[in-house]
Amino acid sequence: MQKKLLSGLFWVLLANLIVKPFWMLGIEVGVQNTVGTEMYGFYYAIFSFTYIFNILLDLGVTNFNTRNIAQHPQLIGKHLSGILGIKIVLLGLYLMVTFGVGLLMGYGSEEFRLLGLLTLCQFLNSLILYLRSNFEGLLLFRWDSLFSVLDRVLMIVICGSMLWSPLRERFNIYWFVYAQLAAYSITAVLALAVIGNKAHLKRIRFDRRFLLVILRKSAPFALLVLLMAAYGHIDSIILRPLAGDGQAGIFAGAFRILDALSMIAYLVSVPLLPVYSRLCKNGDRQQIANSTSTVFWPMMGGAIVAALGCSLCAEPLMTLLYHENGITYAPAFRVVIFGIIPIGITYIFGTLLTAGGYLKHLNRFAAISLGLNIAVNLLLIPRYGALGSAWASLTAQSFMAVAQLALAIRLFRLPPNTFRLPQMSDIKQIIKIIKTNNDTL
């Protein structure tokens, strides 16, 4: 199982480390510099709004499906046709709620125009994540790796052709959203074609009984995703009305590198969930400890080095990305970048607790984290703006990480050597597995 885990990590990280840094630090930064901080802050606030309600497109189905297919792969054909029907029903619910809350928040025509486009992007992205969960559950990590970056590759091609051409002078935030919409659409169609062929999908089923059964089983996952999305993205939603589009744009810019690093941590958790799910089903505590040890120090070592390095070089790094405006991003960036350490802990031990079914505990921790985030934001934003939101984000992430780490050690009785530094034999094993993967290309 460790071989499966390392193989999965190799393929997922290889694909994403090639593509996603270029997307985040090349295309997204290029878009923000082109359209301006305030317009990008407006976009980012609406995006965060749609992201928080994104759970209504899924209701925990994706995480439930990864765990369920990993433990019962023979169910993929039945579940694929039924869950696709559920996704279409959930789209209607998502649209009603997002537009309804938008009305209550006093959104105008410009907000609703952007909101409509971004809700479609969120639906397609949610559909892609669900389709990928089937590859993950079957431990088909090469296919998962391909579809984890295909949308970004297409966006790079589309946006790059506009940003680095005479079209740059006319480029606006809506072109950026249209590019996302096109890329997500192509990726979703291709992913559906591949997994549909493997599962012998003939049609999409709208089965009320199946819908209720799946949603009841996935409800705890849904609540967890909602709470984590809220405490991870509530900052800019609170920041915009209290401090304006400019401060929201500064926070978005400071948050971007953390977002890129968080994506790497997330990618480590992608193969972890199906692997942990199978190990928890078998009750193999020793293998759970071994798998945790395999990823703990690479994750923590990388997170600590990245946080310290980025914080020490905050001003030159922000100036490199945002030119003359970079110095205004540095104070918030110095704080928020340390969030990668608790985020890394969360992606390891939160994934383990999810695989073990300890969702009640995770939901309680996430609710407390959300409360902390809101309280610190309301306390600090009036005086410190984006910097206050940075402290709020770090506070919430840190509480969540410490709580999950302590609970995982207690419930799974993880021995002290789980957290030891990797030995030379571990490194040799990783190199051997990577070499084997290269030989089979």
What are these regions (language model features)?
Residues 1-5, 169-177, 189-232, 275, ...:
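Interhelical loop/hinge segments that connect adjacent transmembrane helices in multipass membrane
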Residues 4-62, 95, 99, 121, ...:
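Signature of the first transmembrane helix
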Residues 7-20, 46, 55-102, 285-307:
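Membrane-water interface segments that mark the loop-to-transmembrane alpha-helix transition
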Residues 24, 28, 57-74, 137, ...:
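Helix-loop junctions and terminal segments of transmembrane helices
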Residues 37, 102-118, 245, 285, ...:
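Interfacial segments at transmembrane-helix termini and the short loops linking adjacent helices
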Residues 47-55, 224, 228, 232, ...:
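Transmembrane helix-bundle signature of multi-pass secondary active exporters and lipid flippases
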Residues 68, 124-147, 337-368:
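Membrane-interface junctions at transmembrane-helix termini in multi-pass inner-membrane proteins
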Residues 112, 116-119, 145-197, 368-372, ...:
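Hydrophobic alpha-helical transmembrane segments
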